[in-house]
Amino acid sequence: MKLTLFAAAAMALCQAQAAEPATSGDLPTVIITGSMPLPTVEQPRDALAAPVQTASAQQIARSGALDISAFLRRNLGSVVVNEVQNNPFQPDVSYRGYTASPLLGTPQGLSVYLDGMRLNQPFGDVVSWDLIPRMAIESLTLMPGSNPLFGLNTLGGALALHTKDGRGSPGTAIEARLGSDQRRGVEVEHGGSNAQGWHWYVTGNRFKEDGWRDDSPSDVRQLFGKLGWSDARTDIAATVAHADNALTGNGLQEQRLLARDYRSVYTKPDLTQNRSTLLNLTGKHQAGEALLLSGNVYYRKIDTHTFNGDLNDESLDQSVYQPGAAERAALAAAGYTGFPASGANAANTPFPKWRCIGNVLLNDEPAEKCNGMLNRSHTRQENYGFSGQFTALADLAGMRHAVTAGAAFDASHATFRQTSQFGYLNPDRSITPVDFFADGTEIDDDGTPVDNRVDLSGRMRTWSVYASDSVAFNQDLTLTVSGRYNRSTVRNRDAITPGGGSGSLDGDHRFSRFNPAIGLAYAPAKGVSAYLGYNEGSRTPTAIELGCADPDNPCRLPNAMAGDPPLKQVVTKTWEAGVRGKLADVARWSAGVFRSENHDDILFVADNQAGFGYFKNFGKTRHQGVELALDGKAGALDFGVNYTWLQATYQSREVVNGSANSSSDADAPGLEGHIVITPGNRIPLTPSHIVKAHVDVQGGRDWTVGLAMTAVSSAYARGNENNQHQAGGPAYLGSGKSGGYAVVELNGKVQLTPRLSIFAQVNNLFDRKYATAAQLGATAFDANGNFAARPLPAVNGEYPMVNATFYAAGAPRSVNVGVRYAF
């Protein structure tokens, strides 16, 4: 009997609608709809040679998650979140040690798709989670490994998001919430359809909070709309999404200052303003009983401004306290009063400013005497493209083939401009600017112009062709073979130093590669299946990585870049194997192993100055581990538990800068030095153990209560790549790692009427103090929180630094309540 695509889709739809656990407790078949970026034939999860994880809109809503990243952290196995920015909408989402982050300077290893459109941005491959409206998401699929069908940057996995439409989400709903730290938000959604085949859906969101850390407000505004038309064979939809957000995330804090005041910030502000507009036209058409055509055309524009108050680390080894005679004369002539005539030092002048102002007036050395800096950047990005594919079903020699083949094109243009203005640090950690910029007008002691300006434009083009054949030999055995060829060109042009040569960012780069994949899924018995898979993926270096690869010229990202030799593209090769099954239609279980090896991995290596570092190709790294999972439903009880053992290690020897590391080869503690990475050293920010568990109880139709726990083991700090740092002496403070932690969330919902419900959530129920990430670096403060230049005696004319561990502190306990009205 022939099975048409239309019948397959209808059957899959019925099963997908049953994917929410039935009241009888039977477990439905899980259908995967996101095995490729574009629509294709839905497949049972057991037919895929990978431990795919999925979630529905109902599951996302029940979790109480603020956004998609929060849901991933709470519910999906092998996922951890590093709160480097300490803003709920700016997390680093890490899966198996591969990251999707909004921060330039974080090596990216995950690709994210929305209705077939790649969300990784052209400049830096970053993912801005604040641009993804949670309420618009109908389902998500997390595909593991370096699956080539998801294109560039799919080194460790791919997240495919699918949005709602008016057919599946009819009606209107209004949701409002209030919470700790002045958190307040309103979401509205409306969907519908008519007999003529038209369907529509729209949702809007406004969210504001003061933030749990000092001076850390955020304002999020999101709008999403979809208009479509469909009949028995065709479905076309046009999507528009707009966001206009202002996010303050004040980043890492030094360990002693964090112990004094958990809500304190190192310096401020750290403001990111994102404005984005996305247009996406998608379509699929059943051209015959066994042929499905699908494709999309898209356009996106993103405008990002950043404004950061930072320490000028060049001042830490300078005499910045007592102004000299010429400086005092200049201050007096300019009308200043109150500056010290003599005797100013660290003890009586905890926040010096007069030498900074005096050197600006004299146009002498403000780059060394001013201890603050205001960094501003502006990034404009546009990208557009299209993709198209066909899926054909055929029976050949008694075997069912599902063949998919397609092509894609993506083009982008990005401009990045940055300026740095000097200033001085205030007691509240803000920076007062002075009239002097790092624009090359001052020459430092080495004879190099002090110039942090960047004016870079880049164009990137990527052509891709891909194909996949899933062969069902019988009901028990499925073989899938696929591959993708990518060809990318990158053209960078430097408006400040054009023409190439030393210091220029000009460059023309070309990258190409064919990435294969093969997988086998076998079901030897009812309720039990096994899989084995191998795949390869690659990513090209981004403009910011190509421009910041010199250890002698580290960058404060995204605030500085320098012309360097081009980096190589990263190639990842992944093996997967595992078994899975059901327990008496009450629970699903799975056990698997994986190994991913990155060749020419691009790593960010920390410099001794906090926030500074550089990119470099590293010979080989390895991510391997074991994953165990159990989830199910027994009566009113819904439960799940995941465990991951992860070993992310370097597999090559390398010498890198390690001045903040106690094991460096520095001539004396606190001076500049290097460390040696050897095979087997663990990669920073990757924990060895991840445990997640949740229990939800359904009290009839009226109420639900849930408890979730996430436990993560310790991880090494950036700057401690050799895993040898030890606290000791006045020059090295802190362990060089972040400790393990466990946090618990409690949420509940009460259905007051068929239309009205209330809900509440308590995050970090036991108010644990913990850190999700760490970095080694020189600190500018003493134990009392006062600025301290030249904190240690000179050694052969050089002043050692006090180096500390900086932590990304986890949010304290917070309570959020809300109400939802649907009609």
Language model features with spans:
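A beta-strand signature from Gram-negative outer-membrane beta-barrel systems
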Residues: 33, 119-121, 130-173
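C-terminal beta-signal and adjacent terminal beta-strands/loops
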Residues: 538, 710-723, 749-823
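Membrane-embedded beta-barrel scaffold of Gram-negative outer-membrane proteins
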Residues: 286, 292-298, 302-310, 523, ...
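Surface-exposed extracellular loop regions of Gram-negative outer-membrane beta-barrel proteins
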Residues: 244-260, 489-496, 508, 521-575, ...
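Transmembrane beta-barrel wall of Gram-negative outer-membrane proteins
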Residues: 178-208, 213-250, 269-292, 482-484
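Signature of Gram-negative outer-membrane beta-barrel scaffolds
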Residues: 373, 400-525, 642, 655, ...
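N-terminal periplasmic "start-of-domain" segments of outer-membrane beta-barrel proteins
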Residues: 28-63, 89-93, 110
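Gram-negative outer-membrane beta-barrel transporters
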Residues: 387-392, 474-476, 586-599, 614-721, ...
